[in-house]
């Protein structure tokens, strides 16, 4: 997980310059494993979104943040867009209690999730031939 405090200004989905350095490190790791597919998930706290910028609510903000990260990984760092997905979880998958300031901060995050290779998974489920 990467804290959204590092990646974005409050209520924004524009990635900060400092965050681009962190994403560069992530990109280096992912480039060295070209077979890996991954999803970038945006998460928010439960405070209702009150900004503008074409953002409707926290769910929308989380999707736009994930998409911003994916676009930077593609355009700035050359990662294969066919290996990436962007998703927003909004406030609906918190790590911590939203009743505290610390909990809200923990819940505002972006997560990079390595996706399983489903063909390999299904091969594991197939019965092995015995000789």
Predicted feature residues:
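Periplasmic OmpA-like peptidoglycan-binding domain that tethers envelope proteins to the cell wall
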Residues: 12-25, 33, 43-131
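Extended, gly/pro-poor, charged amphipathic helical "stalk/hinge" elements that serve as dimerization
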Residues: 1, 5-7
